[in-house]
Amino acid sequence: MISTIEEESDGAIDVYNGSESETGAIIEIEFDADASTIEIKNTTTGDDLKLAYAFQTGDKVIVNTNKGMKSITLIRAGVLSNIFSSLQQGSTFFQLVIGNNHFEYLVDGIPNTEDVSIIFRYYNLYRGV
């Protein structure tokens, strides 16, 4: 089952992982204005992911943090591009811990809810027998 959490207010999102184990996420970021950096920080774990790129209004970025499937894809005017190289040094492809994960995000270094829309999707993982 896939769970979806859309952005909340004030540059913050709470994502509750009801799985029986940690899981990766698929993060969709849609830019409503030009930007040069975006940082998504899991304040629950201290992990963060920072991208630096010449983002344009209308760009969509899809970040996959699932183990074995890590990717960063830009969709611009219907064209898909691999922008893995935009990942900044020290960034982490974080996993969602069991329970609540509090995320804050910065666009060009400031909390911003006007210039981006963010959606988290993740699989609920259950341990087998």
Where in the sequence are the language-model features?
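Intrinsically disordered, low-complexity segments enriched in serine, threonine, and glycine
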Residues: 1-129
